[in-house]
Regions:
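Pyridoxal 5′-phosphate
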Residues: 1-399
């Protein structure tokens, strides 16, 4: 399996501007294929979904196609694919819906490894319902979070556990399958924030064993919206707030208002790009698994090179040494303001923002407060030249 990063880079129009992008964890650049799919949809006759006019058929086919594409990407059932404005919005809606059945004596488990989108919705609605919130904590010295770190908070009163598939700040990847088994042993639900993970590794929600898996296509070469994968049977048991004339059919009952058809066309195009990162035969799911495995191997090698370069910078602190992680690093440098470092890099054409990136609990637990640090993350189009530019700029800064 040969990963052709140069071939992908040729399809990325934003890269022609010359920047080295380490801002992929906040949102990737998009290929021509995705932009073309969005443009073609907007330039065609548009309508709400139906089976009458050609425009109605087109809208319906776009939605059906996007559900199948996301199901292929995640190893999920297309009948359980829900689209929303963002992962944050979807998670808030699901939390509100589930909390209808929570009350005093119930317990909800969240983690200090998570983006706030997989923390605050659960905390808000647990507190409103009178349920107790329990916090799973990672080791700030290593960035590791073991299954035991989570499951020691799970018991007969637990209703739901929410956990990231990979930290968007430090890359740590918990053992989701082990957590899922422990959660289900207590008949609780398991909600996974897969926003950061989905961009870097093959995902199989059935193998993970989670009840809900949420992600965002704009983190893996697609447009801005959110996606939830769940069992259709589970979704049938949930009754979200919705408009009276809106359908009660699953998964549509969870999708408020008219879907953004042009963005859904872009989602399908993004999944097709991922499926074809490595040439080969097979159906789309098989090609996705093969391509994402090749991408993971490629990024692991490039990450090693980036990590070694970062470790050579005087005064630098890297905030994760977790064994299983994505190619994402957050760092600070003694004597330098993180925002000033980011601006210095930007002046040299290296995009590496500084923030807590909404991973507020992570940042605080690491001792970084609300300011966070400088984050550098690899994306499918990252290459060795990008890494060399980053390290050279940091050496210039600290010389």
């Amino acid at each position: 399996m040969t990963y052709d990063v140069d071939g992908l880079r040729m399809r990325m129009p934003a890269l022609k501007e010359g920047a080295a992008h380490f801002d992929g964890p906040g949102g990737t650049q998009i290929p021509d294929d995705v932009a073309d799919a969005i443009d073609a949809t907007l330039r065609s006759a548009v309508s709400n979904r139906g089976r009458g006019t050609a425009a109605e058929w087109r809208a319906d086919d776009i939605v059906t196609g996007a559900r199948q594409a996301m199901a292929d990407l995640l190893g999920a059932d297309p009948r359980g694919i829900v689209f929303g404005r963002s992962m944050t919005q979807i998670t808030m809606d699901i939390a509100r819906t589930l909390a209808q059945d929570w009350g005093p004596g119930d317990e909800i488990v969240v983690s200090r490894l998570d983006h706030d989108a997989d923390v605050r919705p659960w905390v808000i609605h647990a507190e409103r319902a009178g349920a107790t919130v329990r916090w799973a904590e990672f080791d700030p010295a290593t960035g590791e979070m073991t299954a035991h770190d989570v499951l020691r908070h799970v018991g007969p009163k637990t209703r739901l556990v929410a956990l990231t598939g990979a930290s968007n700040l430090i890359g740590t990847r918990p053992d989701l399958a082990a957590v899922a088994a422990g959660v289900h042993a207590h008949d609780a639900l398991f909600y996974v924030d897969g926003v950061h993970l989905t961009a870097h590794a093959p995902v199989d929600v059935a193998a993970i064993g989670c009840d809900f898996y949420a992600c965002s296509p704009y983190k893996f070469l697609g447009p801005h919206l959110g996606v939830l994968a769940a069992s259709p049977d589970l979704l049938e048991t949930l009754h979200p707030d919705k408009l009276l004339p809106a359908t009660n059919v699953v998964p549509e009952r969870f999708e408020l208002g008219t879907l953004p058809y042009e963005l859904l066309a872009g989602v399908t195009a993004a999944v097709d790009v991922l499926a074809d990162l490595v040439p080969g035969d097979g159906d789309r799911r098989q090609r996705i698994v093969r391509s994402m495995a090749a991408l993971e191997e490629y990024e692991d090698g490039l990450h090693t090179r980036m990590r070694e370069g970062l470790e050579s910078i005087p005064g630098i602190t890297l905030y994760s040494n977790a064994k299983h992680r994505t190619p994402t690093e957050t760092f600070t440098i003694d004597g330098y303001d993180s925002q000033a470092i980011s601006e210095f890099l930007a002046e040299r054409g290296v995009n590496a923002p500084a923030s807590n990136f909404y991973a507020l609990e992570v940042s605080r637990w690491l001792g970084l407060g609300d300011a966070g640090g400088v984050r550098v993350g690899l994306a499918p189009y990252s290459n060795a030249d990008d890494v060399e530019r980053l390290i050279a700029a940091l050496r210039e800064l600290t010389a």
